[in-house]
A protein has these predicted regions:
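Hydrophobic/aromatic-rich, well-ordered segments within soluble, folded domains that form packed cores
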Residues: 42-63, 195, 199-218, 584, ...
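Intrinsically disordered, low-complexity linker/terminal regions across diverse proteins
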Residues: 31, 234, 269-272, 284-287, ...
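Noncatalytic, helix-rich "gating/capping" subdomain that lines the substrate-entry/channel surface
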Residues: 94-395
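Sec-dependent signal peptide recognition
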Residues: 3-11
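Short, low-complexity, disordered segments immediately C-terminal to signal peptides
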Residues: 21-31
């Protein structure tokens, strides 16, 4: 399974831009209005806090906020920070592109050239499909299985992954070793179920997708009848792939998705595919140690390699390249607009394309994120915030230590192992100690298409080069400006990039109640991931190992079944319910995160005065809830219900708090209130 990245960031939490570019230097909070940790003006006093706390804390904002037309969702905290960061990063990239290079920055010339290539819409229009046709010509060399292997390797090398994915990963049984991973993939729709379900909504999306595919092929130069014929062949191939893939819930099982094999085993599983040719053309002929996430998918690949004619493979490879480059907005506007219309209507609900400059900030950050991130961190990240965050982390780890020492349902052997794991957790805050080397990344200022392929190729090669080499424990999986955080179970580490360590999550000089309610819960959330239904399966060294005695493991499962049942009962959108099994890990982390942060706050604080008219205890919970105020279009809610391991924001607030006696006490909520679950139904894991 690819290295687990358990994230807080909403997949589409984007927002309207602020006009004007900020000056370089200073605090990002000085560049744009910041969102306060607690804002009474956005609350709805007509709602009782004990009935629906999310509506109480966010209701005024939800009633008045208008989603910008280019946004599928807007989160009051994540999106507000993201928007400020986009402005700051834009200013850095523009200055580099203009040739005003700061010698203290890393690779400003490459940052500037990549940004300029992305922003050159006239140049992209003028080049037309020239680069695409050159890549298609290489795909047209696919005439048999050896040439198909070369064609797949060429595309995989360029970060386009038809048929399957290949990556590096830590060996789940020996986390010190880096091996290769062959994983299910190759689909164009967001999830396998979009191909397999036969309800009216799914059939509508399937029909719309085939029409979209045909229109894209026509834009790429095919006659309409030939485009329609290729569409049906491509769709049939993708649907066959989808039918052998595991669901997102099945893919959450680290035991099931760990299947170690060597090159001979890979060749035995898929004998028709010339793996030696593929690996040689990939540039990694020496790879010999692998895991695969989905053995049945390898069986399906074997069938497809044996039975699918070369002309279908050529059509499919061309489509996957075309779709990838259109998603990067590296093709003329007609491709971008066609793709937007399909995805917005069926999956996001956005009414307009995101402004080009915002896309280019994200693309530049994706290609050269640690170069841009070094400049960002040097100018805008305050070290005092880093030290305060470390203190909060320490306090929350102490709360977890106390919890593990006292929890009644855990026996001593399991408790010792849990405490040992907690003591070995590594915390990374702000930015890495060593910055990524981009010497080998090739950027072509005159061609955004080639720059995207160059950046993709650099990253694929960097990733695969790790196989067989010593584990780099200093590597970060997120760039510093990212408004996010994660726990990695195989490295047993928590990472808090600089991007999230600003208002409203962390506010210098704010009362502890506010900071613990916001960034403190983020910390508690990530810490709990180390002991959720997935994280608990890894030991202190990051190895997949059952260190729980059977009776304690059974009790853990009983407690998590309560969480599944609770969230299964929540409405997501229309007639769709939250998937309690898909969201289980995040729901456990939400439950544990708020409880641990509240315990740490109570242990750390001296007497605090009321905050914005609330007691300190109440202020903690208001800050927590207001961090999740989110407006989301129904199209995106439907997509998230099918694919996102996070619950909708309302339930990320009301779900945990309705299980928490400390919340009920803070607001004097009586038994029977909407925010007080019956004692027999109350869920508690950590």
């Amino acid at each position: 399974m690819p290295k687990t990245r358990l994230k807080l960031l909403l997949a589409c939490a984007l927002a309207a831009c602020r006009t004007g570019a900020p000056a370089r230097g200073g605090d990002p909070g000085a560049q744009a209005p910041v969102v306060p940790g607690i804002d009474p003006s956005i609350m709805d006093p007509s709602v009782k806090p004990c009935d629906d706390f999310y509506a109480y804390a966010c209701g005024g904002w939800l009633k008045t906020f208008k989603l910008p037309p280019d946004k599928p969702a807007y989160n009051r905290s994540f999106t507000a920070i993201d928007e400020r960061n986009l402005e700051l990063l834009r200013a850095l990239a523009e200055q580099d592109a203009a040739g005003h290079l700061d010698p203290a920055d890393r690779y400003p010339d490459k940052v500037g050239d990549y940004w300029a290539a992305c922003m050159d819409e006239e140049g992209i229009e003028a080049r037309g499909t020239r680069d695409l046709m050159a890549a298609f010509a290489a795909i047209d060399e696919v005439k048999d299985l050896p040439s198909l292997a070369r064609g797949l390797a060429r595309l995989h090398r360029a970060g386009v992954f038809p048929a399957f994915r290949i990556d590096s990963t830590q060996d789940a049984r020996d986390a010190t070793q880096i091996i290769g991973e062959v994983a299910q993939g190759g689909l164009s729709l967001p999830d396998r179920d979009y191909y397999l379900k036969d309800d009216p909504a799914a059939q509508g999306i399937q029909k719309a997708y085939r029409s979209h595919l045909t229109r894209m092929l026509v834009l790429a130069g095919l006659p309409a009848d030939e485009a329609a014929r290729q569409t049906e062949a491509i769709y049939a191939l993708e649907r066959s792939m989808a039918s052998a893939q595991w669901t997102r819930v099945e893919m959450r099982d680290p035991e099931r998705t760990y299947n170690r094999l060597n090159l001979a085993g890979l060749e035995k599983a898929v004998p028709h595919f010339p793996w030696a040719i593929y690996l040689s053309d990939l540039g990694h002929a020496d790879l010999s140690a692998f895991t695969t996430t989905t053995p049945p998918y390898l069986d399906r690949l074997e069938e497809l390699f044996d039975s699918t004619p070369p002309e279908t493979w050529r059509a499919y490879l061309r489509w996957r390249l075309l779709a990838t480059m259109a998603s990067q907005r590296a093709l003329p506007r007609a491709f971008t607009q066609e793709r937007f219309e399909f995805f917005s209507k069926n999956f996001t609900g956005a009414k307009e394309l995101e402004p080009r400059w915002k896309h280019c900030v994200r693309s530049t950050e994706g290609a050269l994120g640690f170069a841009l991130g070094q400049a960002y961190a040097r100018r805008y990240f305050g070290e005092d915030g880093k030290e305060k965050t470390k203190a909060i982390v320490s306090g929350i780890e102490s709360a977890m230590r106390n919890d593990l020492a006292e929890v009644a349902w855990m026996d001593q052997p399991t408790r010792r192992m849990a405490l040992a794991k907690l003591e070995r957790i590594v915390n990374k805050v702000g930015y890495p100690d060593e910055w990524r080397n981009y010497d080998r990344l090739q950027v072509d200022r005159s061609s955004f298409f080639q720059s995207v392929l160059g950046a993709n190729a650099f990253e694929v090669n960097r990733d695969l080069d790790k196989i067989g080499k010593p584990l780099d424990r200093g590597e970060w999986l997120m760039v510093p400006p990212q408004v996010n955080a994660y726990y990695d179970p195989q490295l047993n580490e928590m990472v808090f990039p600089a991007g999230i360590l600003q208002p409203p999550f962390f506010t210098r000089g704010a009362p502890d109640a506010v900071n613990y309610g916001a960034i403190g819960v983020v910390v508690g959330h990530e810490l709990t991931h180390g002991f959720d239904d997935q994280g608990r399966q890894y030991d202190a060294l990051g190895n997949l190992k059952d260190w729980w005695t059977p009776s304690v493991g059974a009790e853990f499962d009983r407690r998590t079944a309560c969480v599944v049942k609770q969230y299964d009962g929540y409405s997501a959108v229309d007639d769709l319910k939250v998937n309690g099994k898909l969201t289980l890990g995040e729901n456990i982390a939400d439950l544990g995160g708020v409880r641990l942060s509240y315990a740490a706050y109570r242990a750390a604080r001296a007497h605090e005065a009321p905050v914005a008219g609330f007691t300190p205890e109440q202020a903690f919970f208001v800050a927590y809830a207001q961090a999740w105020c989110t407006a989301t279009r129904p199209e995106l809610l439907r997509l998230r219900t099918a694919t996102d391991p996070h619950s909708p924001e309302r339930w990320r607030v009301d779900g945990p708090l309705s299980n928490l006696p400390d919340f009920a006490k803070a607001f004097s909520c009586p038994e029977g209130s909407g925010m007080v679950r019956p004692a027999a139904e109350r869920c508690a894991v950590w």
